[in-house]
Amino acid sequence: MFQMVEALVLVRTGSSETLNLMKTVKEEICKVKGVKEVYGVFGRYDFAVKVEAKTTEELGNLVTDCIRGIHGVVYTETLVIGF
């Protein structure tokens, strides 16, 4: 049986970003194919994003090409869900 690769992507924006830009970043993340849920969080990161992809390669492309390419995103950390 085929199983999708699921991950949590922790996203950090620039520390001086305005609330308006944060909302824009969240809206842009929500548009990315494969994004299932987006949460604003407190702490070192600004967003926790649940994503789904067919392969680990597709997951890598989703993060590097799509999420990291959004204006305002300065850093991501990806946690692949194992169980």
Task: List PLM regions with ranges.
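A compositional/biophysical signature of low hydrophobicity enriched in polar/charged and small residues
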Residues: M1-F83
